[in-house]
UniProtKB/Swiss-Prot annotation:
Name assigned to this protein: Histidinol-phosphate aminotransferase
Gene behind the chain: hisC
Catalytic activity line of the entry: L-histidinol phosphate + 2-oxoglutarate = 3-(imidazol-4-yl)-2-oxopropyl phosphate + L-glutamate
Annotated source species: Clostridium botulinum (strain Okra / Type B1)
Classification via PROSITE patterns: AA_TRANSFER_CLASS_2
Spans traversing the lipid bilayer: none
Family (UniProt): Belongs to the class-II pyridoxal-phosphate-dependent aminotransferase family. Histidinol-phosphate aminotransferase subfamily.
Amino acid sequence: MSKYWSNITKNIEPYVCGEQPKNKKIIKLNTNENPYPPSPKVLQAIKNAARDDLRLYPDPNCDALRKTIANYYNLSKEEVFIGNGSDEVLALSFLTFFNPEETVVFSDISYSFYPVYANLYKLDYKLAKIREDFSIDINDFKNARGGAVITNPNAPTGVYLSLDSIKQILEDNVNKVVIVDEAYIDFGGESSVNLIKDYPNVLVIQTLSKSRSLAGMRIGFALGQKELIKGLNRIKNSFNSYTIDRISSLAAIEAIKDEEYFKKCTSKVIKTRNWTINELRKIGFKIIPSKANFIFITHDTYQAEDIFIKLKDENVLVRYFNKDRISNYLRVSIGSKEEMEIFMDKIKKIINKL
């Protein structure tokens, strides 16, 4: 540990992301990436963007992209905030809306970046314990003193919370911001975007990494009433005015516009998810109902860690969490149909040998 580090640096426990192997032969089902490439229109936009004007700074307000997203969701561009991936948007949101002396509430089994942000900003937080079936008890979020964060669908479980439940949480916290993290909403859930008009305290955060196949370009955004977005811009412009580069912005615009390609790819992921669930059930796995591009699975006979290790030996990566209550579960991203057929073949052979 360096003597030059600040106390925060010494004490923080950083987020640990999923393994990113260099071997292209590995079937990668561990970080919830889209198995399909970006829209051809996105790739063409990237090629066209390689021009002389790359020497100039990009638009700090991302006006063209904000207008595109606003039109898509029937909002004004003043209700859209752009960031360098939804992780940055989340980090800025924690700093914008939550106070150190007030307790923020989020689930004990959820995106593990939340406690990292809270500790980084010295926020007090409470972990709301999820039920045994991994559903959320909305009463745990009632009158949160500092605000609340809901992942919907939840990660790593894939469990979806109804809009009526989201409404109740918003109504129970009218004086505090409720962040709804919708990284996986396009794989079967109904977005809380439709609540923005009636609820000034809701901030919806989405990403183009999952359903739009742009994880490599880092584009996230927040949607909310103008006062919330204005606050986010104040914090963003105190860190870095130019969060999105010119090429990423142009690629994102085309990704949003190509609705036909988006629907085709998400439909294939959902279809493959359902097929995989059925196949796993045939060999005794239990699967938590999922509205995401991944599934959360367990088996009464076999240990999740053993299966995880054996799959890795077979060049198939899934995600294992050595944490209380979920240490016998695996999170499996939904790949292409061909990848999931290989996954099924490998996992059948593994459990037959265990």
